[in-house]
Amino acid sequence: MCIVSHRYIPLTEKDKQEMLQTIGAKSIGELFGDVPSDILLNRDLNIAEGEAETTLLRRLNRIASKNITKETHTSFLGAGVYDHYAPSVVDAMISRSEFYTAYTPYQPEISQGELQAIFEFQTLICELTDMDVANSSMYDGMTSFAEACILAFSQTKKNKIVVSKGLHYQALQVLHTYAKTRKEFEVVEIDLDGTVTDLKKLEAAVDDETAAVAVQYPNFYGSIEDLEKIHSFIEDKKALFIVYANPLALGLLTPPGSFGADIVVGDTQPFGIPAQFGGPHCGYFATTKKLMRKVPGRLVGQTQDDEGNRGFVLTLQAREQHIRRDKATSNICSNQALNALASSIAMSALGKQGIYDIAVQNIEHANYAKQQFIKKGFEVLDGTSFNEFVVKFDKPIQQVNEELVKYNIIGGFDLGVVSDDFKNHMLIAVTELRTKDEIDTFVEKAGELND
């Protein structure tokens, strides 16, 4: 065993020589002799000399201060990642060592606390969506959506899925990526009528070869789809109904399960997960008892031990890749347990009434912003919305956003990135955290820039 002579340096020259001697190599060069010499660097890396910790911290803070964040600027950017209130208890709880490094265990009986936390997450998701079963979490909402489509193909033995272009464009990209690995799968995208799915085109596309119909609720453009009407197109076609739903909106809107949804998926980022670098997030996946044995990911169940005490176990494990890899419903293994815990704590801290109140605030704040834009002379696209809506500008959105930053405002999402049909259109998110003054300032500056 090597003795490390430097407290903070785990690999000294003495250590290197001992290891080389053990494996029978005379030098590092001999060890990597199989690597072609023309691709070797043959010089030391260009790394600066070490600095005192205080000096280094000051320099890194100066670099970090160049970032534009929701702490330094007022954000109206959403499009899948939102600036919501997270109760202080969330960080306090998930930072506990029992949870912070916990991995979903293969021997569940030794991690009852972790399994109970996951069980509570599943229960909360079922309550929000009005579904029977939810899994322990997935990577993000888009992964959950793609897995839902794969389940539909497997369950129905059909090869066509009809999806609304009102779905998040990146969710559609993920689905197309999955579909490329299965050439027989056909993805049919349905155009929009304004900011909602064109129901006539959707109805015409659904036939006996359709495995599933998928929509978002509220959709990517902020509008609320008519789930009851859409479900009526599916009932006699033996296709599954997949709904990608914002869980916060479900605190107020009628849940998809009440409209006959077979699978409800989404992202719990609005509950306790900060907006940072696009992730990490936490996908949820909820379905019916009929489809329970085809659910991807892990399921935690409640049971009793020999003495009658309540306990928790990983259940229906035959679906998983560590049991039968070739027949697994999914190869997702390690999940987002820590983020699922964060969302569970946030939902529990807020309670049903708190979630409802925040959802109402989102609608009220967004509607106020809508009216202010209309008064300012902007064209606001029609559609009943939750906390996002679309505004048309006379100038390129990228240009508008670059100017807004000068006023410490992060503008909305440039929809021209998604479709030429939405060139010069901005998707604006207004959450419960946005104040009247912030909204008024945003509208005022946007109006000045649009003149």
UniProtKB/Swiss-Prot annotation:
This is Probable glycine dehydrogenase (decarboxylating) subunit 1. The glycine cleavage system is composed of four proteins: P, T, L and H. In this organism, the P 'protein' is a heterodimer of two subunits. Its EC number is 1.4.4.2. Gene3D superfamilies: Aspartate Aminotransferase, domain 1 (3.90.1150.10), Type I PLP-dependent aspartate aminotransferase-like (Major domain) (3.40.640.10). It comes from the Bacteria. HAMAP family: GcvPA (MF_00712). It comes from Staphylococcus aureus (strain MSSA476). PANTHER family: GLYCINE CLEAVAGE SYSTEM P-PROTEIN, GLYCINE DEHYDROGENASE (DECARBOXYLATING).
